[in-house]
Amino acid sequence: MNTPQKPIHQVLLAVDGSEHSLAAVKTVRDMALAATHCRECRVKVLGVLPVSEGSNYAAYMLPLREAERLLNEHSISATADLIQGYPAEVIVDQARVMQPDLIVIGAKGLRATLGILLGGVAQQVIEHACCPVLVIRAPYRRINRVLVCSDGSVCSRKAIEFAANFPFIEGGDFHLLHVLPPSPVLTPELLARVWTLSDDALDPTLFTTREMEAEVEASRKAGDMILHEANELLLAQNIKAKTMLLQGDAATEIIQYASDNAVDLIIAGSRGLSSMQSWLIGSVSRKLVHYASCSMLLVKQPLA
């Protein structure tokens, strides 16, 4: 079934003057120029004036005006707005009001702790945003090689549909990846290597080698089907991807694959959560956005 075209019309772009936010501005420029509906795209360049910095309004407006200029000179409709408050709270609140198709934010801001891979503001926005979030890492580089992750879930399907309609630079290199669960399957024999088990527990009839092989084969077939269905969604939008089936810890395998193949952007889904659970976006998604060295697009499944 073809994926309906859902172009990105409204973008909320968070800017604070950091190197990462400048890379985010340039990425939004690339997106808008790659989109067939470029002139219909509206970008809100949002800055946050810390409560303690009220007297420095002009200084905080400078990077916003520069971002606005950089976008406007390419005929991209952009307006700048500086709001006083707490950064993550302001960005999330503005997203609720604006209902953008996408939030774009730098991975780290000016005040990020040295050595961390993801700043606190970006982390909070990812956790609480009501729409897809694109986290851009510096230095700026055009998004050419894209890794789309699929696990067969509804959240994953939403991410693939979003990716299929994302305005990438023409001629991009797409990779589609599914990770099978770690092997081997837990058996009494394996447990016996660590635990002291009774002879009855080691009864080979409990789980035979043939049954183990059948489980592995069934898992592989399920993985192939997940890749096939995901690939069909991309092909519906004329996106040809290299498919890859790996096995192991999902986050570890994805991060390693992205590193080995010089991926510019990882795209993954994440389930929407209630306010009680909002600190958790899913263990795999959380690891990817924290530890991947490239930019990350996280597409959240809205709450029912």
Predicted regions and their residues:
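Small/aliphatic-rich secondary-structure junction motif
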Residues: 2-59, 74-76, 145-210, 233-242, ...
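A generic structural signal for short
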Residues: 55-57, 79-80, 110-111, 151-152, ...
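Short, conserved glycine- and acidic-residue-centered signature motifs
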Residues: 21, 60, 118-122, 156, ...
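Structural beta-alpha unit
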Residues: 1-6, 20, 30, 36-42, ...
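Gly/Ser-rich helix-loop-strand patches that form or flank binding pockets
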Residues: 1-10, 88-140, 252, 256-304
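Short, solvent-exposed loop/turn segments at secondary-structure boundaries
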Residues: 55-58, 70, 116, 278-279
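Structured loop/turn residues at secondary-structure junctions
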Residues: 16, 83, 138, 151-152, ...
